[in-house]
């Protein structure tokens, strides 16, 4: 699994900025993901002599009107290129004015297959890949275990966490944080099982879609504190699943422990770092990190069988292999 967060993006730009010519008059970001790197590239830049003479780029001035007659070299920037469809759409949108400018195209992250589709790219990041700015709405969440407190909603304050009426009020009215638009595979929380009605009510009110909700089956908060099993409880659910490829956890301490126990990656929303110091061979094969050609072959077979299974000639053996390939990638 290849993951990049905003710190990685900023570092990548700083490390590879020299590949871009310095004569671009205008940088155009592709909404929405391309706007952030576009702003980073368009920050005021100068050299020593220019600085001494008080000359800097004025990209930060609000309300400034640029004379388009002075714009000649334009760089269109997106965060990444995958299939190439988004970049192709950009070219089509700019087709009517491309004769007026020298327009070139840049992405920060490219896949090997489409790196030639742009004029500049900063880093090759192959599949499977995920970014901080899109992972919470990515289809990978369908194969993800996710914590609730600190991820979907704020953590309770010490005053609210009384295992009584104040806590029940918090559960029903917790302020939301990251609410995905896609379905989450499994919600795994250290909340006690007795608070399932309140938890489900909050999830429904905040339009959180999920397939499964796993809660800690202990009698009260005191028993939970004695057990001190937050990370091990979550790791047991995550590690026992062959479908779930990721765990999203709010606590860095727990994230590291879940990764250690399962040998599977954990995304920590405390820092938006991906923890995968410990890995298993099974995970590496399934994610494509080991023998990526094998994963590509499995995907091709899955897609081929999926199209074939709709026909009347697909027998039980065909359906069995289709199910196998679906679970394997």
Q: Could you tell me what each predicted segment is?
A:
Residues 196-244:
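Substrate-recognition "cap/lid" segment bordering the active-site pocket of phosphatases
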Residues 23-27, 184-187, 242-246:
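Short active-site oxyanion
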Residues 178-200, 214:
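Substrate-recognition element of Asp-dependent hydrolases with the DxDx(T/V) motif
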Residues 106-108, 243-286:
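Acidic, Mg2+-coordinating phosphoryl-transfer loop and its flanking beta/alpha structural elements
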Residues 278-329:
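Membrane-proximal basic amphipathic "stem/tether" segments
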Residues 1-145, 153-174, 194-201, 205-209, ...:
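PRPP-associated nucleotide enzymes
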């Amino acid at each position: 699994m290849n993951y990049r967060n905003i710190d990685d993006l900023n570092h990548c730009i700083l490390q590879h900025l020299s590949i871009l010519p310095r004569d671009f008059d205008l940088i155009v970001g592709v909404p929405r993901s391309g706007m952030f790197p576009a702003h980073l590239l368009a920050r005021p830049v100068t050299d020593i002599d220019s600085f001494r003479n008080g000359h800097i780029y004025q990209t930060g001035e609000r309300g400034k009107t640029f004379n388009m007659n002075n714009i000649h070299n334009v760089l269109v920037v997106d965060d990444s290129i995958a299939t190439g469809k988004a970049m192709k759409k950009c070219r089509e949108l700019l087709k009517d004015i491309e004769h007026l400018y020298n327009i070139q195209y840049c992405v920060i992250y490219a896949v090997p297959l489409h790196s030639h589709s742009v004029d500049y790219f900063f880093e090759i990041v192959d599949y499977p890949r995920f970014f901080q700015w899109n992972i919470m709405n990515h289809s990978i969440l369908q194969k993800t275990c996710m914590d609730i407190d600190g991820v979907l909603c704020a953590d309770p304050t010490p005053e609210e966490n009384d295992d009584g009426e104040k806590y029940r009020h918090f559960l029903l009215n917790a302020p939301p944080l990251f609410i995905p638009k896609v379905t989450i595979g499994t919600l795994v929380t250290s909340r006690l099982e007795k608070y399932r009605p309140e938890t489900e009510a909050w999830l429904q009110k905040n339009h959180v879609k999920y397939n499964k909700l796993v809660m800690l089956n202990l009698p009260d908060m005191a028993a939970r504190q004695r057990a001190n099993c937050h990370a091990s409880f979550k790791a047991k659910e995550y590690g026992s699943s062959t479908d779930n490829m990721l765990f999203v956890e709010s606590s860095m301490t727990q994230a590291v422990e879940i990764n250690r126990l399962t040998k599977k990656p954990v995304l920590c929303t405390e820092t938006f770092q991906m923890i995968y110091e410990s890995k298993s061979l099974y995970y590496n094969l399934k994610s494509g990190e080991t023998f990526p050609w094998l994963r590509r072959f499995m995907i091709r077979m899955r897609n081929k069988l999926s199209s074939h299974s709709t026909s009347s000639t697909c027998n039980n053996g065909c359906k069995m292999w289709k199910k196998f390939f679906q679970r394997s990638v």
